[in-house]
Amino acid sequence: MADANPTQMKLVCAAAPSLLFRSMSGLEEVSRLFELRVVAVSDDPKISADAVLGKPAAVSIEVADGQQRWFHGIVAAFGIDGVDGRRFSYRLVLRPWLWLLTRSADVRIFQEKSVPDIVKQVFGDYASNFVSELKGSYQPRGW
C-alpha cells in the first residue's frame, strides 16, 4: 500500500512573510484570468493592507511525484478575517498581473508604432518582467 502523504501547500508573500497558508479556493478557466482566494494565519495582528495590496504573492501546491505547481499573482484584495486562538486570520485574493489592465479606463492613441511596440508599452506599465518572444518583422501602423 502506498504511503498517504497530505498535499503540501505554501504561501509566499514577501510583503508579509509571517503569513502562513491555511486554505485556498479558486477559479481557473481556459482563456480567463484566474482568481485565488487564500486564507492565511499569522501571529502579527498589524499586517497592513497598504503593505500587501498590489504586491506579488504565490501559492505552491505539491502535486504528483513531489513536483510543485505555482500560482503567481498580485494581491488584489486583503483583509483581516478574525482571530483563531492567538493567531490572526487574513483573507487574500490573488489575481494575475494582467488583471490590472481590466482596472484601467485609460484611452490612448498610438501613432506610427507596430502592434508589438504597443503591447510592450501597455504591458510595461504593469509588468516589468514581461518578455516578448516575437521573431517577425512588424510594420508601424498609422493609427
Label for each model-derived stretch:
Residues 1-56, 60-70, 78-80, 88-101, ...:
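Juxtamembrane "anchor/assembly" segments of surface/extracellular structural proteins
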Residues 35, 120-143:
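N-terminal export/assembly leaders
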